[in-house]
C-alpha cells in the first residue's frame, strides 16, 4: 500500500509512528535513508572528508556542537576576522567550554577610518600556535561581517602548525558560498557548513565534515550537550550509511530532502563550474562597487567572492533601508569586534545561490542599477 499523500513519500508506508504525520517524510523510511546517504556521500566528495554529520538546527548549532565536543576543557585559539568568528568566543563564554582561549584579531594594515582589514599575519599565527600548542584552532573561511576569506595557503600553514602541536584545525565554511574547501589539501580537520548559502537550500541544520584525524579523536571525547552531541549525530549518520536508521532527536526530513535534491542538481551542473561562477561574480561585483567609489573592508588578497562588505558614511545604506526602496534586501553592517572603532560603518552584500551564479550579468545589473539610484 502506498503512502497516503503521493507528494510526501509515494512509495512509503501509511504513517502510524509516534514521530510524524502523513504530511512529513518519516526518518525511518527507505526514501529518507537514501537522502541521508546521498548527503553524506556529497559532503565527503566535495570536501574530501572522512566522515559527514548532520546536526539539526543551523550553522551556529554546528559551531556549538563542535566547540562542546572538541573544545571542552581544552586550550583553544580563535582567529577572529569579524563578528561571526567572535561568535566562537560567545559560545565559549556562554558554555564555559575551554580551559583557556586566545584570540588573534584581524587588523588594518595602516591607520585610517576606511583602511581595509587583513587577517592576523600568518607568521604571527604560526608563532602563536607553536608557542601555545593549542588543542583546537578555530577560524572562519569566509567572515560574513568583513567579507574576508582565508586563502588556501593560509589555511595550510595554520593546519601544519596546528598538527605539529598535536591539535585539530576547525574551519567555519558556513559563508563560503561555492568556494569549496578541500580538506585533504588544506589540512582542515573539522569543516562546518550549512544548507542556506553555498548549497542553495533551506536552513535546517549544520553540515559537518571530519578528517580522519578528527574522526579518530572524536571517539575519545565527550560532549557537554545532549541535543548538540556531535558524536551522537555522527553515530546517527553512520547508522544511515550502514543501511539502517537511528534516532536521537527529530531530523528536519523534508528540508534535508530538498537539500539532497539541490546537491544532486549542483553535482550534475558541476562543482568546479559553480566554484568558478562564484569567483567571477564576486570579482565583478567588487569591481563595480570600486568604480562607484565604495571601499572594501577586506584587504587585497583576502576579498571573499560570496560576501562583499564595503565602508559607507550613509546611515540609510548601512541599515539597508535605501536598498529596500530599490527592491533589494541587503544586510546591515555589523561590528567586527576587532578594535575597529566606534565610527566603523559598513553595508554587506551576499552573492549566494545558483540563481545568482548562473545569471551573473543579471545579478550584477540589478545591483548596479540599485546603487546608481542611491549613491
Question: At which residue positions do the language-model features occur?
Answer:
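Internal helical hairpin/lid segments
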Residues: 75-78, 251-321
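Active-site phosphate-binding strand-loop segment of PLP-dependent enzymes
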Residues: 111-173, 177
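Conserved beta-loop-alpha segment that forms the PLP phosphate-binding cup at the N-terminus of a helix
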Residues: 50-77, 81-89
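Conserved C-terminal alpha-helix-loop-beta "cap" of PLP-dependent enzymes
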Residues: 290-351, 355-362
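Conserved active-site segment immediately N-terminal to the catalytic lysine
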Residues: 184-196
Amino acid at each position: 500500500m502506498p503512502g497516503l499523500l503521493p507528494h510526501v513519500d509515494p512509495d512509503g508506508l501509511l504513517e502510524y509512528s509516534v514521530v510524524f504525520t502523513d504530511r512529513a517524510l518519516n526518518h525511518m523510511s527507505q526514501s529518507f535513508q537514501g537522502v541521508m546517504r546521498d548527503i553524506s556521500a556529497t559532503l565527503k566528495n566535495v570536501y574530501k572528508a572522512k566522515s559527514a554529520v548532520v546536526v539539526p538546527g543551523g550553522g551556529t548549532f554546528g559551531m556549538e556542537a563542535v566547540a562542546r565536543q572538541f573544545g571542552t576543557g581544552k586550550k583553544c585559539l580563535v582567529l577572529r576576522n569579524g563578528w561571526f568568528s567572535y561568535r566562537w568566543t560567545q559560545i565559549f563564554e556562554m558554555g564555559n567550554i575551554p580551559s583557556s582561549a586566545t584570540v588573534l584579531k584581524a587588523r588594518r594594515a595602516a591607520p585610517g577610518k576606511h583602511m581595509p582589514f587583513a587577517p592576523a599575519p600568518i607568521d604571527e599565527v604560526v608563532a602563536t600556535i607553536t608557542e601555545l600548542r593549542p588543542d583546537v584552532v578555530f577560524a572562519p573561511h569566509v567572515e560574513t561581517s568583513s567579507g574576508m576569506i582565508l586563502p588556501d595557503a593560509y589555511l595550510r600553514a595554520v593546519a601544519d602548525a596546528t598538527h605539529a602541536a598535536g591539535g585539530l584545525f576547525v574551519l567555519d565554511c558556513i559563508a563560503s558560498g561555492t568556494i569549496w574547501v578541500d580538506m585533504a589539501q588544506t589540512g582542515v580537520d573539522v569543516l562546518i557548513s550549512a544548507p542556506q548559502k553555498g548549497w542553495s537550500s533551506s536552513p535546517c541544520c549544520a553540515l559537518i565534515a571530519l578528517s580522519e584525524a578528527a574522526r579518530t579523536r572524536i571517539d575519545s571525547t565527550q560532549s557537554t550537550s545532549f541535543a548538540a552531541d556531535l558524536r551522537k549525530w555522527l553515530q546517527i549518520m553512520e547508522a544511515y550509511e550502514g543501511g539502517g536508521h537511528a534516532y536521537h532527536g527529530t531530523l528536519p526530513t523534508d528540508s534535508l530532502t530538498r537539500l539532497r535534491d539541490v546537491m544532486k542538481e549542483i553535482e550534475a551542473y558541476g562543482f568546479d563550474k559553480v566554484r568558478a561562477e562564484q569567483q567571477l561574480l564576486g570579482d565583478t561585483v567588487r569591481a563595480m562597487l570600486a568604480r562607484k567609489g565604495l571601499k572594501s573592508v577586506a584587504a587585497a588578497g583576502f576579498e571573499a567572492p560570496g560576501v562583499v562588505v564595503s565602508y559607507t558614511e550613509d546611515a540609510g545604506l548601512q541599515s539597508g533601508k535605501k536598498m529596500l526602496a530599490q527592491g533589494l534586501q541587503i544586510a546591515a553592517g555589523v561590528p567586527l569586534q576587532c578594535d575597529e572603532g566606534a565610527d566603523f560603518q559598513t553595508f554587506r552584500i551576499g552573492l549566494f545561490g545558483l540563481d545568482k551564479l548562473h545569471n551573473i550579468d543579471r545579478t550584477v545589473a540589478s545591483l548596479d542599477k540599485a546603487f546608481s539610484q542611491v549613491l
